[in-house]
Amino acid sequence: DTLRIFVLGESAAMGTPEPAFGFSRILERLLHHRYPDQAFEVINLAMRGINSHMIRRIAMEAAVYEPDLVIVYAGNNELVGWQAPEPDQAPLRPLKMIRAQQALLSTRLGQWLWQRIRPFKDEWNQEQDMAFFRKHHLSAKDPRREEVLSRFAGNMSEALEVFVVQRVPVLVGSVLVNERDFPPLGFPSSSEATPLNDPLFALPWWQACEGGDREWLEEQLP
């Protein structure tokens, strides 16, 4: 019998920038090589630009196909992305409203209506380049971060629960972060304390920049 493995996640799980070299393809080749007498199907259900709100829906639909193993690698798009907080937005959109929109868009009638009533310029359909991410970065002290983390935990719990009740094994991977070569996208505004005045930030920052040009770095900060 064929063993079916589902991969859930976002662009990193999909294999961006080239899905042909994503870890799901590599995993499938490794399994075929290690167990030549066993048939495997590694099905990548990841998508670029989504987050746990969508992963929850995908998981519920995927569970119907009774996979033998599920691999989840997600968490990159919670603070910047669809339904994420924006710097100039006050409260987060109510969770019930998000759920209602998703339910509506799961129907053909809802999709037809959405195409006609949504704004002509949908910002989240634009290219998400570095300028986009710099525009949407949030302060480390933004209180909405806690709500985002709470929603992420809730969404993932519901997504995993549908497989747990079916006794399907689930592997959940931590999101990798390249802290050495990928500095913060931005710094607090002038109305807030600068990073170098924050003792929780300053020490690890300078330690990470050891060997660099400290004077040049100071000139770049607000």
Show the residue positions of the predicted features.
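Membrane/wall-proximal cationic-aromatic binding patches
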Residues: D1-Y35
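Second-shell loop/turn segments in exported
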Residues: S11-E18, N44-L45, D142-L149
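Serine-dependent acyl-ester chemistry module
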Residues: D37, G75-P222
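Active-site-proximal beta-strand/loop segments in catalytic clefts of secreted hydrolases
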Residues: L8-G9, L45-R48, Y73-G75, G173-L176
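Structural motif
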Residues: V42, R48-A59
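Short, well-structured alpha-helical segments in soluble
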Residues: I55-L69
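Loop/turn elements at helix/coil->beta-strand transitions in domains of secreted/extracellular proteins
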Residues: T2-R4, Q38-E41, Y65-V70, V164-L171
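Short, solvent-exposed loop/turn elements at domain surfaces
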Residues: M14-P17, S52, V80-G81, D181
